[in-house]
């Protein structure tokens, strides 16, 4: 850290004299960021590093703004980045969509860094909340609405449609149901849903790329209503797909459903990964290890942590009133991942395809209730494509 003129330490609760400044902030041109010691700097790192991400994102937006011609698409916005597969981003992104003021917003919606202070307050805890009857009813309502929004997205999936157009439909469907699209501005995520095509594992940002015949695409929906979040996703075929894609998507769905069949009071959360990996490996596929299922209710992400791979160290035992997601990400090749320079798009390191399915579940006295199930069919959409 570089020495600078005397200032007051920016760590919350510390008013000591500060002569050190974050070197990364200096490089990025961020003003301020003064600390009294390495210890204070390290103690503030979890929130401070978000300033770096925001500055990098704003720099990227400034670069994007230089593309002024209508229809001018940049498929290589990050000079020097080596893509792992054939997929490319299609920039610029459209502007952030507004949410009417009458719709209730989560605490991160208007935070400059998109940070959820309520989640940060419980970060690191392994205590799993048991929902009250009132909470459970709130979750039933919001999960039903999330399902309706995903069903709207499902009708959009076809060759020639851009993932940006799917995101637009999702955004409008949320507003029509008096819901806030939970991904929007969550740690500055720029869109209202995630769309993950082919080698994208998760957290793909909707953009101007048209879906192509033979693609697979996952659409991940979370909505917020009356203080609760509901979360689900499905993977879809785009037109006719090859047999490898069919096997991958079918196996991924089976991994989810076999894990759901095991959910009941007394089961350890770590057991779900054993079930998922056994079925994936039996079919020649691998299980992503970097991203997990999670508790969800008034918080978007909270305890329990639900890994999908075998021999994990997840903490906790299922009890009636627990609500959480299972969302296995299954890959054709290796499970290793990397992230695009946008800070969100997770892709397979070998460029091979990945699929995912997700439900939000309530542990009952005898088993579980799939809160995000389809009401008009027991089959996921891909089985009817």
From Swiss-Prot:
Belongs to the peptidase M24A family. Methionine aminopeptidase type 1 subfamily. GO terms for molecular function: initiator methionyl aminopeptidase activity; metalloaminopeptidase activity; zinc ion binding. Cotranslationally removes the N-terminal methionine from nascent proteins. The N-terminal methionine is often cleaved when the second residue in the primary sequence is small and uncharged (Met-Ala-, Cys, Gly, Pro, Ser, Thr, or Val). It comes from Gallus gallus (Chicken). Its main location: cytoplasm. Keywords: Aminopeptidase, Cytoplasm, Hydrolase, Metal-binding, Protease, Zinc, Zinc-finger. It is found in: Cytoplasm. Zn(2+) 1 binds at residues 9, 14, 36, 40. Its cofactor is Zn(2+); Co(2+); Mn(2+); Fe(2+). Pfam families: Peptidase_M24, zf-C6H2. The keyword Transport does not apply. Zn(2+) 4 binds at residues 231, 294, 327, 358. The keyword Phosphoprotein does not apply. One of its GO terms (cellular component) is cytosolic ribosome. A zinc finger (C6H2-type) spans 6-59. GO terms for biological process: proteolysis. This is Methionine aminopeptidase 1.
């Amino acid at each position: 850290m570089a020495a600078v003129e005397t200032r007051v330490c920016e760590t919350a609760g510390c008013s000591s004299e500060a002569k050190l400044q974050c070197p990364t902030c200096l490089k990025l041109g961020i003003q301020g960021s003064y600390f009294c010691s390495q210890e204070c700097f390290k103690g503030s790192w979890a929130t401070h590093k978000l300033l770096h991400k925001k500055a990098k994102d704003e720099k990227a937006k400034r670069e994007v703004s230089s593309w002024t011609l209508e229809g001018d698409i940049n498929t290589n916005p990050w000079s020097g980045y080596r893509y792992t597969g054939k997929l490319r981003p299609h920039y610029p992104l459209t502007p952030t969509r507004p949410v009417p003021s009458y719709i209730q917003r989560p605490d991160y919606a208007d935070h400059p860094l998109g940070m959820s202070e309520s989640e940060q307050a419980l970060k690191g805890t392994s205590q799993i909340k048991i929902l009250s009857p009132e909470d459970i009813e709130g979750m039933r309502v919001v999960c039903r609405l999330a399902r309706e929004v995903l069903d709207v997205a499902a009708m959009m999936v076809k060759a020639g449609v851009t993932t940006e157009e799917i995101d637009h439909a999702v955004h409008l469907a949320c507003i029509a149901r008096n819901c806030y699209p939970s991904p929007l501005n969550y740690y500055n995520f720029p869109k209202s849903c995630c769309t993950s095509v082919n080698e994208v594992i998760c957290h793909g940002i909707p953009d101007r790329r048209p879906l192509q015949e033979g693609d697979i695409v996952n659409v991940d929906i979370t909505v917020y209503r009356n203080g609760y979040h509901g979360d689900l996703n499905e993977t879809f075929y785009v037109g006719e797909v090859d047999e490898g894609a069919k096997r991958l998507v079918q196996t991924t769905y089976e991994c989810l459903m076999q894990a759901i069949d095991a959910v009941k009071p007394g089961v350890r959360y770590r057991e779900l990964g054993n079930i998922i990996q056994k079925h994936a490996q039996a079919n020649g596929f691998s299980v992503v290890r970097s991203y997990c299922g999670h508790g969800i209710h008034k918080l978007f992400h909270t305890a329990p942590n639900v890994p999908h791979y075998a021999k994990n160290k997840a903490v906790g035992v299922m009890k009636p009133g627990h609500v959480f997601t299972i969302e296995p990400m299954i890959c054709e090749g290796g499970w290793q991942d990397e992230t695009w320079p946008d800070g969100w798009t997770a892709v397979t390191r070998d460029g091979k395809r990945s699929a995912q399915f997700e439900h939000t579940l309530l542990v009952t006295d005898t088993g579980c209730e799939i809160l995000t199930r389809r009401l008009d069919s027991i089959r996921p959409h891909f089985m009817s494509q």
